Each structure stands twice: as C-alpha cells, then as structure tokens.
Amino acid sequence: MKNKVDVAIIGAGFAGSILAAALVKSGLRVALIDSTRHPRFAIGESSTPLADMILRRLGKNHQLPYLEALSTWSTWQSQFPEIACGRKRGFSYYQHHRHQFFSEQFLGQGSLLVAASANNDVADTHWYREEVDQFLFRQAVNLGVTEMLGHEIVQIEKEPSGTFTLRSVCDRGVATLHSGWIVDASGSSSVSASLPYARDLTHTLRTETRTTFGHYRAVGSWSQKLKELGHNLNLNPFDSDDAAQHHLLENGWLWMLRFNNGITSVGRTEWIGPAPDGKTENGERPDISKPQALPNDFGDYPSLAEIMAPASLTAPPQGVRSTGRLQRLVAPVLSQRHLMLPTAAMTLDPLHSTGIAHALAGVDRLLNIIITKDNETELDSAVHQYETSFLQESELIDELVSTAYLTMGDFKRFTAACMIYFAGAICSEERYQDGQNPTHLWNADDRNFVQFAKRACFALRQSNNDYQAIISEGLAPWNTAGLMDPRVQNRYAYTATK
C-alpha cells in the first residue's frame, strides 16, 4: 500500500467513492479508508430530482459516465440491471388514525401525492445501498484509488508542513498514511466529529427525532390495499408504491421504499422533542430508552398491519436497528484542508429525502475546491463559502423538517409545511436545469425565500391564524408548480423539471 497520497477520504460509501473517482480522474493520488467492508447494510436510500441532476453533472464534468446512467430509472435498468434499485415517481403521504382503516371523505383529505418526474423513463430511484455503494467503490478502485477497507482511524495529526498523518488499525497491525487533504465522508460515523477541535452545533437544531428501521421481504402493496378499501386510484398522478411512501402515524411516520429485488426498506421515525405547546399528549416526552418495534406494533393501524403481516426481516442480521436522538451537527471545516461532506457533518431526518442530494452537492463543491483552488486566498474564500452554504442549508432544512413534525397531527397544516420545502427544492432544480451553479440547495441562498420560510413556519406552529393565506400569498414569487392549489386536491402531477 502506498503511504503517501494527495487526498485521504474517510468513508467508502457512495459519496466518498464518487469523490475519490473524480479526484483520481483529475490526476490526484487518493486513498479510500473505511473501518468496514462491502457489501454492507445501509439506509439513506431515496434519491430526488435535485440529487439526480447533481449526479448527472458529476458524471459529465468528470468523465464518469456510469453516474449519468444511475441518474434515471430507465438508464439504470438498461445499463446496470444487476444493481437493485426502486422506481421513484414522487412522494406520497397518507394520514392514519389508530384502530381505523385508512379512509378519506374526499380526495386529498388525508393524502398527498407530489410527482417528481413526468413518466417512468425519467423517474428517480431508491438506492439499494448495499449494492450501489459496493459498485461505486469498485469503480473508484478500478480507476486507481488506493483501497483501505477494514482500517479504523485511531489518530489524525496535522504536521508543521501542513500535511496530515493518519494512523489506522487493521488486521495486519497499524498503518500510517500521509496526505495533503482529508475529506470525511464517513456519514453518521462522523469520524472527524470526535476530534477535540471539532465544533459541535447539535444544540442549535430544532428537530428531535429517533428512528427504527430494517429491510423486509414480501411487504404488501399499499396501492392494492387502497383498491381493496375502495379508493379510486385513477385520480393519482402515479402509482403510490413507486414513491417515497410516508405513512403518518401518531407522533411520527413510517417510510416504505420498494426495491425491484423484492425487498422494502421500512422505517419508523418518532418525534421525541417538545410538542408545540411544550408537552406531549400525556404531559411527558417519549421515553427513548424503550425501543420502537417493527412491525409488531402496527396492530394499532390495521391498514398497515395487513400489508406488513406477510413480511419478514432480511437485514440487518442482528434485527431492526434503533437510534437514540438522530440529529447531530458539526461545523464541516476542521482546517483549511480537512473538510467534512454534509452527510458526515450532519444527520437531520429522513422526512424530505435530503441526504443524497446534500452529499452529492458536497462532493461537487469539494471537487471544485481541491482541484481548482491553487492559491491560499482563493482557497480560504472557497472553504469559507463551503461552510457558509452548508450551515445555511442546514438551518433552513431543520426549520422546515421540525415544523412538518409539529404539524403532523393536522394534515392540512402538514401539507402546507411540505409545500414550502417543495417550492425550495423546485427552485433549486430549475436553477440547475438552467445551467446555473448555485452555491446552496433548496433556495437557501435566497434571503427573501428564507425569510418567508421562517415566517410561514412560525405561522404553522401557531394554533389560531390564517396560515393558508399567509403561505399561499407569501409563496407566490417561488411557486412555479402550482403548489397550494385547492383545485388539484393534493394531487400534484407537474412539479417535475426533468
């Protein structure tokens, strides 16, 4: 193994592997370091139009055509059918009530479908991470990246020369690596966050949730269940199973992401912070020492219990995985040449499927910094912008996600909260589509939009106000997709920009 590289990347997930491949294509020496090996179980699986636009951009700009192929359902299926994924036409939401089958008195009363693509050919995807991550890692290694799997980082030192020395423990003993740059792509492991000079900002986050998740075989079709319950599916813009499917429950929600290998990712996320009035229903905050269950406690929700009845857990092998509080936030700049990808610096929440896009945007930005910034002044400015963009994006998404949770008990308010997120996402998509190079995702660099979002979220968290008018009128400058239109009955077919 070479013990000197230009860039050491900690974490061999999809983002680290894509970054490594692009850096090697530019002529740099790169090592990928990870304490585990492929294949491995992972979540963070739902892509979005914004993520796929950035993926195509990375593929074109860095001569990595396989990334372009993975950016739509049809090209993925035609070029890499052996890698499992799921077709994602959009986002679907259904509000459930305890001890009742799902029902609506009128279309959209307790359901919302938001299309993210015009048809199946250009649909987004759910990533079966076990296979996707392994594929992207092998592509990077085939291009010349130094492979260091099974290496646990135990020490990082910055030398007087400005370079770094990384020491890791592996089966063969202790390994030493010297590098000019460090990029932490370790995701929720967040190796750099444990360093004494890391700046922990978790206390600034509003969102407080935990999650329990696993992969199941033989999960029933929600679309078929809706048919059995007498719902007219012809009015839907897409099959609700071809979606990031959100089932809203008391104090949280359940996700279902269906892959084309018979496996469904199922996860339950629960709000564990204070309710809008400072209390939960029984006056106490949830006891997070008691794990959530999957799927045994779905008996309270009979529609879900029926589609989960035939299901069996396939991964992780030790049983469903549960977290404590999910949220963490660390400033992503440890030093001028020691940086963290967004998904290593923050874990927020799966609600709006922001993780893949945020990770890929970070890859795109770091490639620009590492490859093109030659002098110290340019580098200082670019690194400062990198941190500023990340923190402003994180603040906005935290505001939107926490507000969505606090309004889940009122489906109209929850839907309105989601519309703010969709407006920001669509604005970003349109900017990428126009060939722009935005410094932020989700329109977080538009001061007027951010101020509107804060006002709207404040209104949504209050019990007595005309939030519908506040949001409908305030959203107008950015509402290119007809959001908040009561005539469509929560069925949005034309939000896609592909």
Q: Where do the model's predicted regions map?
A:
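Short beta-strand to alpha-helix junction loop
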Residues: 117-139
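Predominantly flavin-linked oxidoreductase catalytic cores and closely associated redox partners
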Residues: 135-303, 363
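Glycine-rich FAD pyrophosphate-binding loop
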Residues: 24-45
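C-terminal helical "tail/cap" subdomain of flavin- and related membrane-associated enzymes
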Residues: 369-498
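Beta1/beta-strand and adjacent pyrophosphate-binding region of the FAD-binding site
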Residues: 2-13, 31
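N-terminal FAD cofactor-binding segment of flavoenzymes
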Residues: 40-102
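FAD/FMN-dependent oxidoreductases across multiple families
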Residues: 250-254, 258-260, 272-401
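N-terminal Rossmann-fold NAD(P) dinucleotide-binding loop
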Residues: 16-17
